[in-house]
Amino acid sequence: MPKIKTSRVKYPGGWELIEPTIRELDAKMREAENDTHDGKRKCEALWPIFRISHQRSRYIYDLYYRRKEISKELYEFCLDQGYADRNLIAKWKKPGYERLCCLRCIQTRDHNFATTCVCRVPKHLREEKVIECVHCGCRGCASGD
């Protein structure tokens, strides 16, 4: 007799520790997606979504790599279910990308002259005015800041 597949996801042990924070960030994400973008530039409408996505990924990264409070099974579950960005976390593990805000800032095809975003320039090399990234609104994510 074939097994019956259910749509219910089985959560690994330790999920109850991170669930309230994940649910809170999901609610913020829904609110940011439904928020009106009247008076904002086209690119500015997506900035809150990028910030919340970064915050959620950083939360899971810190729990697993820095504080070591969650198991590998729970960490992999969060990545597989889309609670954290696997590619962004992979970049955070490399030297020089520890504070990276989003993957679009390091993709050379999205920028003039095949370079990275202005937010990747260290603060001591910039001019005095504050510059925000066009993609995600970051003001600086270079590791030397």
Swiss-Prot record:
PROSITE patterns tied to this protein: G10_1, G10_2
Keyword annotations from UniProtKB, A to Z: Nucleus
Localization annotation: Nucleus
GO cellular component terms attached to this protein's record: spliceosomal complex
GTP-binding among keywords: no
Family annotation (InterPro entries): BUD31, BUD31/G10-rel_CS
Presence of keyword Nucleus: yes
Family assignment from sequence similarity: Belongs to the BUD31 (G10) family.
Protein name (database record): Protein BUD31 homolog 1
Organism listed in the record: Oryza sativa subsp. japonica (Rice)
Lineage: Eukaryota, Viridiplantae, Streptophyta, Embryophyta, Tracheophyta
